[in-house]
């Protein structure tokens, strides 16, 4: 697969002013006035308050050079001046921010949109292009005559104001000290009260706020493209619906949305037993999230087997053109107890797919704050992770015990933590690290990204995140308690393997 170098952008496209119609020939008339150089201005805030001392970079993509830099003042404000049109070519300027200890997400008040965008130029260095994509938040502005950009703002995050709260997995039975059910991390929910039958062919999930088609088998099986179309065209009057919905309101769920239904305490199907769904198959269900394949397209999409909640990764289950999988439909944009994070996928391959809709809380950049003591904070979820990713390795029971006894002085830690404060991540926690625009997350986590002058732009996030390896979660496979759920280090798919197998583990608190 093709790796990508991408970033999240807000594109501000100004409109050219009208011509004056004045003659510029020898018979008279005034020559056109030189266009006023454009300006870019905005504010950086943290929890709604101005954040001073943030370095703001104005990068010109036409020349792949830093055009100018600024530092936010006591009011969190910055201004750039002098953006011009050169000849008939508008200057393309990308603004991004950095301050140690924070991640950022952009917004702009003039109608521009936040979205991810392919970008390679800044990371051309003596080693060539990075092996994996890097995604960071910028405001992209085309400098057209007399069109200043205002309200080019950034919100800062440090983990204490994390926008995402993870849900509990639903595991009820404990199989070992320190496992998922014994620790019970995540937003609690009750299967008996979580779902509401709306008596109109829909079911509302109060945990996520999503509204699901009650008849999970009505749309049947289809190839991926046909499934997307069927979901997009679903409307009241079909599949038992009397909700007044119209075509375009329903969609195929992305991988995070479908995963949110999985109850790891159940099997056949792996859904809460009291959920009022009908005709749920134990087979393989499509998601609208593709494997990243570059801007030209991808031949495969993520699928989940609902008999047990396993992600599928084989040609018979994932190829869009040949695999016939079951389709479910969802609508709504949240409003529940928790907010689901976006998958990170951003390339639109088809109408209604994940790349088009990008549903969920967007990912922040830089996402992780390195505390210099062997720990990292994820600004999206607020979780604190062990930085050294290869320190704990073994069978599931031994890995659990090692994490339970982990303390400062071990595995590169100098944080003052003591035994009992760390835990093995559950299925939802480990999976939350995923960014579905990456084809090899372990590679991305380990890589040093350098600017053209070979200076470091981003140091490795984790230390020695091992490629092509299974990383344990504390969550047991309810369909076979001799197995536990793992997350594969490259694709971040969720797979069950025997607890007697050897695997790596991260630690979290």
At which residue positions do the language-model features occur?
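Short, acidic Ser/Thr/Gly-rich low-complexity loop/linker segments typical of extracellular
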Residues: 62-83
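Short, ordered, surface-exposed loop/turn motifs in non-cytosolic proteins
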Residues: 38-40, 46-63, 73
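Glycine-aromatic-enriched surface loops/turns that form tight recognition elements
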Residues: 20-30, 133-251, 255-423, 427-509
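Bacterial N-terminal signal peptides that target proteins for export
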Residues: 1-8
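Extracellular beta-sheet/turn segments enriched in Thr/Pro/Gly and aliphatic residues
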Residues: 28-31, 111-143
